[in-house]
Amino acid sequence: MLKKLLSLVSLWIPLFLYAQGVTISGYTYDGLTQKGLANCRVSIKTSTMDTLLAQVTTVLQTERTEENGNVFVYQNTQIGALFMLQFNAPISAQAYHLVIEKEGYESIEKIISAKSLQKERLDLGDFYLFPKRKDKILGEAVVKATKIKMYYKGDTLVYNAGAFNVSQMDKLKSLVAQLPGTELKDGVLKVNGRPIENLMLSGKDFFNGNIQAALDNLPAYVVSKIKVYEKAGDMSELTGRNMHDKSYVMDVKLKREYIGTWIAKLQADGGTSRLWGSQGMLMRMDDRQMFTANFDANNLNEKREMSEMGDGADLFLAGRFKRWNAKVNYFYEPNRYWRFRTEAQVERLQSLLNEQSYQQTFFPSKDLFNRSRQQNKERQYTTNAFAAVRYRFKKQQHELQYTFRFGHHRRQSEKIALSWYDSITTQNWATISLDSLYAQEKDKSQTPLLFSLFHPTLSKQVENVHTLSLASIYTLRKNVLKTYLRYQAMTENDTHNENYILTRYTPVSPDWRRNYIKDRSQAQKAEMRAEYIWKVAEKERNNGELTPYIEYKYNHGDATHSLYRLDWDSHFATYDWFSKLVDISSISDFQASCMDYNNSYNSTLTEHHSAIGTQFNFQHKTEKGNVFDIRATAETSLAHRSLAYLRGGLSHHIQCKSWLFTPNLTLKWEEGNTEDQRWLSSAQILYKGTPRLVNMLHLLPVRDDSDPNNISQGNQHLKNAWEQNLQLLYQSRHRTMQHLWLLEAQWRHVFNDFTFLSAYNSRTGHRIYTPQNTNRTHWLEGATSYAIPLGKAQKLWLTAKLSGDYYQGEILSYIDGTALSQNQLLQSLTITPQLYLTANISSKFRASVLWSTALQSVQQPQATNNYRTTRLRSDFTWQLPWDVELQSDINTLIYKGYSERSINQTAIRWNASLHKYFQLSHGTLSVGFKVYDILHQANSLQTSIDQFSRIENYTNVMPRYALLSLVYMTNWSSKKRSKE
């Protein structure tokens, strides 16, 4: 009996010593060739090296591809050789010893803590094994792995995600911002100066071309590699030939263990100043389908992440926003024939914006100044839906798409404005508060004030848009026929209520009125296009095609604009008139007496646009591998437009027929990638000519004085405009040192550009706008940058950049009684030097520092204004012991030369946060504490300058606050794991 008990105890002891089964995975590469290295022996032992827990051999991954109906199976050497160690982790072990060995290569050893194995899975990323040197004496020396950040595989740029520092809660956007050569600005993602046209996920267009959605939703820790390359389009895939339809894409490769895995995230925020937020995400992706669902509700101005390195968003977000958003996306590709995509989104946005504006209008004799304060309250509801189905059969492809949009927008605002001419008396008025200035001047018999305006408004807008399209591709031997059909129907209903209290400090009588405006419009658009791609050359070195095409567009729209006006009368109490907005629910009672027939109208616009053109594509490869690309397009079109317009009892009928010519030319050169070259260069020159049609409403001989301060009238002599755009892009990179030099330049000129002649009344301050043509509008932009890694380990990257832009516009503003000066130009020149340093010191620390100074000079005939804005930004993320993460960022803006003296100073926004991560049995919990604007100096300033005026806007911003955040992230697999 005793022997049986001892036997049972001996069987149970290992079950307690080995607590749970874990899986450790990773990839092995040849450190020189950057290819997957198979047959490496990977062993895991206890830290004392006395017990071997598991041992496997790395293997290359097998992939399938289909081309012309044939299935090819091959081993992919570009994604690394995989190893997966499965074993039971002993409770008594304090650490584990991982050894990677292969004959002829330096071995790699890595210590793994027991705490890191609390999860069921652990991905170690990529390991690069280097061949042994012949003169090295083999001993017990251990070679530590160095992760290579980036390398080129042919024309494909590959980033190793494991070599960059990302926290457990970072999104893909944070990882992409660290990649050398990438830039994310104004919603455009660029790599080496070239815009990314699409973001793929394991080679599939899961996000339907929405790059921002991919950056904001995909967790960074699931990414293995990021590849940037030119991807062949649908025509090339169907024909198996080069059809010149490549696009520049970023392809995100997931770690193998997360394919087929559900990923979920929940977040809750609460802080001072009554701030709150909640966020959730659910996602799953495999080889055939992807599902994502997320929601977000917060009043944090949508600035939810602590610090995203390289983020180009505004430093100080204006206004206060509350946002509720929910979105579902599904992609399914069951086989090579069918593909389904669908997306639905519902959003509610509520905002409060307090804005102060300072405007200086340029005149030859004296300038006009205007100061205003305005509060805007808005509520928006939008619903967007999208569905698409694609079918491929043999040599055909058809894709049907449907989109729907519903929007409801309500806006209420209150505005007060003062206006005066420049004089000695008014020199200091920019520094006096608006209310004090009004109280000081309103009762004076002699005041420099020109007028004051109180203007509360209430508007509502409802719109519906339906769009249906069908795109088809037919392959005819070596050639391709493409067709495209599209139909769109849109309706919009607007209502607008306003009190308009205009007081003039001149002998002219004041203008006090109430307006009610009702707009109804509907439009239908149809489009048809057919093109035939004819292969004229198909050789290894010469490949070309000629594409004749025809296109037809139809547009028909009806609009009704009804204006009801009620002038002030003595029986209205002044208090009610000033403070209460008119809310006319039924206009039938006074429709006949209040209708403003002179400013109400009905219009019907019909457009027919027919085009015929030819596109020529040709590619030539030299013996040395240099590539020359030519793409030329010539299009001739006829635009026939008619406008029926009824206003003030008068009927107008206008017809315009315009012959248009649209040329495009792109020349591209890429240097061949040969072993004897140190530098690889490429250049691109693009010219584009675009005709711009005149607005038919501007041709009408009518006068609109519904706004007594801004009167507009038509010009029957307006001509069509012609825009020319010339761009140059040159880049050169060093093969081994990874230095990158970029040069960009762009020139734009508009012949017969559309602008407005502004005539100001010196007594009343009202202005009359008349559309005009001008030939003196020019833009010139340029930038050059040089990026280098500091050190062989590429832990530091420095980018130096110098950019400049020049704008020239003709001044067409004058005061009545003075002649319009000829050849008066406004010229604006801005030069901006910039330095940007990023650092990934280790897997625990990353940081970035940016400095830039924008030097702007604005010249007009009587004055020259100089502005300077210096921007300093630094941030870091430091992963401390005990799973604690510290983040901080400091953003500094230094203003000089602005009218408001209070702005000409230094504004610093300093944020900091601390996160503690808890590894739970089924996920990760993060507890974070964040302090925003520690020094309480954040502000918002926006400026704009053109040939008419200079405008400075100052808006309210987020207050200083402290925020507590709880984030829980987990993942689980729906696959059944086999026991081995």
Where do the model's predicted regions map?
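Structural motif
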Residues: 27-38, 51, 147
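Primarily recognizes Gram-negative and organellar outer-membrane beta-barrels
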Residues: 66, 209-212, 232-274, 288-980
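Short acidic/polar hinge/loop motifs at secondary-structure boundaries
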Residues: 205-232, 287
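Short, acidic, small-residue-rich periplasmic hinge/interaction motif at the N-terminus
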Residues: 29, 43, 99-103, 121-162, ...
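Extracytoplasmic beta-strand/coil segments of soluble accessory domains associated
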Residues: 173-207, 225, 234-244
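Short, acidic Ser/Thr/Gly-rich low-complexity loop/linker segments typical of extracellular
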Residues: 50-84
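A short, solvent-exposed loop/turn motif at the edges and junctions
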Residues: 78-112
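Short, polar/charged loop or turn motifs at beta-strand boundaries
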Residues: 156-178, 191, 201-206, 267-272
